[in-house]
Amino acid sequence: MTSIAEQTDAELGGRVSVLARQKRDHVKLDRLLQQLEGTHGQEQERVLLRIYRLVFPHAFAEESVLWPVMRRALPDGHALTLEVEQEHQEVNELVTRLERLDPDDPERGPVLERLVEVLREDVRDEEDELFPRLQAVTTTAELRRLGVYWEVLRRIAPTRAHPVVARRPPGNVISALPLSVLDRLRDAAEAVARRSSGDVADRLWAASRVLTAAAHRVERFPLLRIGEDPSTRSTGSAA
């Protein structure tokens, strides 16, 4: 089977195909990871925020739309998708840990290196194995339909790490609205805070912390953990 990285949009079912959309996001991620190299301080935080806002909605839409299809369509679909769900879980846990570390903490470097490594592993697994398998058992029309569903969910999905939430429906789907609202309010507050100074910036950063704490409380609602595999379960102690 040919990796989707080596196929054209036409071969992937057209630009609206879920495979073409995935490939475009992966290209964007690769560029951001290259930009991340050698950054420090506020510049590193800005690049990381762009990575988070790309990666987390992307993964949420995969877990809600694509992986259930693969589990139904492929005899080994459960094992294939579970491996990627475990990678997604590790990304959530690494980002949560990274956000708690001070910029000059010696642990930050190794955590960041591992995050980049897992993100690249995830892309390779999807492009070289999962998506060619999906392509082999799915019509072009279905790939396009999945692309529309995936894009809709991606646009309303949470934008931050939530390691306690299930990586599978229905828990992750139930979590989408409350966590997305909190995450996007936090994104907006932090974006303005970075352009502000003095009392205004302090108030906005305080608002961001309140929104973060609220999201962590929402994560622990039992309904949001329904459907999860035990191997991707988090106690939330790092949050």
Where are the model-predicted features located?
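Small-residue-biased structural context
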Residues: M1-A239
